Every structure is written in structure tokens, then in C-alpha cells.
Amino acid sequence: MLSGARCRLASALRGTRAPPSAVARRCLHASGSRPLADRGKKTEEPPRDFDPALLEFLVCPLSKKPLRYEASTNELINEELGIAYPIIDGIPNMIPQAARMTRQSKKQEEVEQR
């Protein structure tokens, strides 16, 4: 019965343009819904580190060869192809289009040497 009242209150508050009262906010918060003021805020979490134990299971999606973790750049490196996959919030982005080239092509090296 109480949960039904919470649902009706939440529905009624969502339909109004006026900000909900403090009592209504507490009811919504108790029902598991986040208050409107908190919806746009991001929680400050410390950045997650990459777990090197995952290297045992991860391979380059292009060459199927093992990868090397480079802590200074926070990337997984494929030495053979000369590409680096970024690690974002502790999660490797293994999409080939997201990888960056670590080696310059011969044509670029020649242009820079001139």
C-alpha cells in the first residue's frame, strides 16, 4: 500500500513543473529514485587502473598477437603493427579505429628529415 502511494506521488510530481517539496524529495529518494537535483551531477570516483593480469587473455584484434602494457601512456601496445590501444577508466578500448599509430610511416620520416 505504501509503495503504491509512493508511485502515485512520484507520477504526480513528474507531471508538475514546480520543484518538489522536501517531503516529496525524501519520499522519492526512499523509493530508490534519485532526486532531480542529483541527476545531472557526476559522482567523483578515483580513476580505475588497468589490471595487468588481463594481458594473459587480451590479444590484438587485428593480428591476434599478445599486447604489452605501457603504464606511462596508459595504452596496450602491439609492437608488430606499431599501434597503441587506449585504456579509459581501466577498460582497454580495443576498437581498431580508436588505436593510434606508434611508428611513423617511411614517407613521413623522409619528409621530417628534410
Curated annotation (Swiss-Prot):
Parts of the chain that traverse the membrane: none
Domain called TRM112: residue spans: 51-97
Annotated spans, Disordered: 14-49
Keyword Endoplasmic reticulum on entry: no
Keywords: Mitochondrion, Transit peptide
Function according to Swiss-Prot or TrEMBL: In mitochondria, S-adenosylmethionine-dependent methyltransferase chaperone that supports both coenzyme Q biosynthesis, by stabilizing its components, such as COQ5, and NADH:ubiquinone oxidoreductase complex (complex I, MT-ND1) assembly, by stabilizing complex I assembly factors, such as NDUFAF5.
Further remarks about this protein from its record: PREY and PIGY, 2 apparently unrelated proteins, are respectively the product of an upstream and a downstream ORF contained in a single bicistronic transcript.
PANTHER family according to UniProt: PROTEIN PREY, MITOCHONDRIAL, ZGC:162634
Disease: An homozygous frameshift variant in the second exon of PYURF have been found in a patient with profound metabolic acidosis and clinical features including muscle hypotonia, failure to thrive, developmental delay, optic atrophy, persistently elevated lactate levels in the blood and cerebrospinal fluid, and abnormal cerebellar white matter and cerebellar atrophy on magnetic resonance imaging.
Designated name of the protein: Protein preY, mitochondrial
Lineage per the UniProt record: Eukaryota, Metazoa, Chordata, Craniata, Vertebrata
Gene that this polypeptide is encoded by: PYURF
